[in-house]
Amino acid sequence: MLMRPPVTLGSGIRYTEVLDPKLHGCLVSLHFAVPRDAESAPVHALLTDLLTAASAAYPGLGALSARLDALYAADLSASLTLCGDCTDLHFSASWLDDALTPDGRPITAQVLALVLGCLLRPHAQNGAFNEALFAVCRQNLLDEIDGILGNKREYALQLAAETAFSGEPAAIPPQGDRGRVLCASPAACLTLWQEILHTAPIGIIAVLPRENPAVAETLRQGFAGISRRPRPVTWRAPSPCRAVPVRIDDEIPISQSKLVMIWKYRDIPRRTVDLLTKMLSGTGTALLFVNVREREGLCYDCSATHSPLKHALVIECGVHPGREEDAIAAIGAQLEALRTGAHPDSLQGEAVLGMEYAAACALDSASGIANRIAAAAYFGVSPDPAADSAELRRISRDDIMRAAGALIPDTVLVLHGCGEPNA
């Protein structure tokens, strides 16, 4: 695998190309970095659907999908990821390499034309997205929001985030507020998208099996007609630590209780917290799995995640009703074990091996490679697995102990199950 040094395709447009001959397909990943607020959040979510369901050249619902299928099942998709207080609007296209098409027909140029057509010439008239398309996409988003409310795990995580990051953009749900989705208009969505095209920093990652200069040149020419005025975006936005943690208790009709605990920190190296998180959750010997779930039988599941841009550690689990306080105490005991060094000697090494394995697996696919490069840009993780492994192995047991001691309790959310089995 060869990763070329990034180049600039235009003002605020960074292009990174990776060549890996073991791959059979090509992938282009476009990332638009945008600030978010309560009004723009639902529009960002709508754009992921509006810009990939149709275009000016393929306006009919299903026409774009049919065209992609005709190009040997090429794919165009979109997603959004919360990065601190900002949003990463991500569009990705993948297709079979020209050298491997059954009839020898080159398709790279056609796929890139479809991608640029969707982004630069969407299905819109008179300064607004097409009404019929907008109605379908809005209903899709409303259904997604309703689905999250029905998924009590996601609902609990959302409520905990709203509490822990109150007053910060990170408190806004990824899909935005349902009421604001209903108030969004086709014209407002197109206006915001045009603003994003002109002002958002753009990161483009191309993962190809062989060198093809036409990919970068096609993208450069595609964006050349846009008057770019990129605005800087700050990804790292540490959330203020509370002097006194807050606790919220509520009852909901589910068969198991939901528990979310959040800690914040001021100044701990990012990979140290990543490794600490892996020691808590993510391996067969992780503390939460072995002690809280298996040994004490307090929960159905228990996992830990790290939000490095917000300086937050999140632990969530489904708890047997009536044992919520036991679970809170047991989770706290695992962090105390890390703080005092009372954890097994092998635990840290096993966590490092798990992280090294995940990094190696990411290199097996074009999407994994692209995601790792994007993570390097947003989160500061080295895209080179060897360099990242060396950094992880430099972390000492004392580093983990100090990190665990520097975590500051912030939020505890308990949704007490009242017995109806619809969790």
Range-by-range predicted roles:
Residues 54-57, 98-102, 121-130:
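Short, polar/flexible loop-turn hinges at active-site or ligand-entry regions and domain interfaces
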